[in-house]
Amino acid sequence: MKKKKLLVMAGGTGGHVFPAIAVAQTLQKQEWDICWLGTKDRMEAQLVPKYDIPIRFIQISGLRGKGIKALFNAPFAIFRAVLQAKKIIQEEKPDAVLGMGGYVSGPAGVAAKLCGVPIILHEQNAIAGLTNKLLGKIASCVLQAFPTAFSNAEVVGNPVREDLFEMPNPDIRFSDREEKLRVLVVGGSQGARVLNHTLPKVVAQIADKLEVRHQVGKGAVEEVRQLYGENLEQVKITEFIDNMAEAYAWADVVICRSGALTVCEIAAVGAAAIFVPFQHKDRQQYLNAKYLSDVGAAKIIEQADLTPEILVNSLKNFTRENLLQMALKAKTMSMPNAAQRVAEVIKQYSN
């Protein structure tokens, strides 16, 4: 019997790519073939082959900040990308197409519609991106991570790594903690300059009360070391953290951006958080953070309001019991079967 095949269209950032990989792996375990459609110059080109998933490319890029010439050429570029995607779809003959966001999704989604292939969309953020808003009109099914992106789409959560759900529950992790407050600082894989510059000033004021792990992002270790100065004893600085599940579980509180994947990872582990949303025009990260802050599982500090003093006061006001309650509330908001549910919908529409 011929194997079923899924074409994944996702790219650009980890927030699109990692949830798509989780779904792809779920279907691979069920004997599906997977093919990926991306762009050569974004992270999926290097990342996806590491998971033994073949990847093919179309030429498309974003238009933001590209100037008038790029805008003028945009219709031609999109038309070319649709034709490229259509050719690949005709060659690969997928039973379904999964759109997880990124520049590639738009033209590939149109091509899938032209080829008569069912399109399943997944919106990772609390507010839908332009591509998914448009594709939502032609998709066979739209799924969402948070209940606010689409008014009539099923809420399934964000597919995250299984190891996050395997960590001990917050009440077990917190049971023997009596020492300094454990603070994990994460600025995404690129780090976040505002956190790199603010946290050393926070530690300088309350170094005796904190133990800090700080992921600073690529190339920032030396600069941040110098900023921490004499307080380095309290801080472990790394470019990247390989085992994020363990790092989240170690922490009493996480200070970080509020990308969709980060918010769902924190819920999966069950951790208290202080979110400093990136300042998008559409308030995307702020709305993601509200998913946990609205139930008392997280605190939001807007970047414009972020000062060392505000962060110091926030940390001083936390007790371990208070942070444990936040962590337990975060855990109740997790959706452990997101990848499986997306896979089920794909199977349903592929028949």
Curated annotation (Swiss-Prot):
Broad EC category: transferase
Binding residues annotated for UDP-N-acetyl-alpha-D-glucosamine, in chain numbering: T13, G14, G15, N125, R161, S189, I241, A260, L261, T262, V263, C264, E265, Q285
Q: What is the reaction catalyzed? A: di-trans,octa-cis-undecaprenyl diphospho-N-acetyl-alpha-D-muramoyl-L-alanyl-D-glutamyl-meso-2,6-diaminopimeloyl-D-alanyl-D-alanine + UDP-N-acetyl-alpha-D-glucosamine = di-trans,octa-cis-undecaprenyl diphospho-[N-acetyl-alpha-D-glucosaminyl-(1->4)]-N-acetyl-alpha-D-muramoyl-L-alanyl-D-glutamyl-meso-2,6-diaminopimeloyl-D-alanyl-D-alanine + UDP + H(+)
* Gene3D superfamilies per record: Glycogen Phosphorylase B (3.40.50.2000)
Just give the chief location class.
membrane
Q: What does this protein do?
A: Cell wall formation. Catalyzes the transfer of a GlcNAc subunit on undecaprenyl-pyrophosphoryl-MurNAc-pentapeptide (lipid intermediate I) to form undecaprenyl-pyrophosphoryl-MurNAc-(pentapeptide)GlcNAc (lipid intermediate II).
Would you tell me the protein name for this molecule? UDP-N-acetylglucosamine--N-acetylmuramyl-(pentapeptide) pyrophosphoryl-undecaprenol N-acetylglucosamine transferase
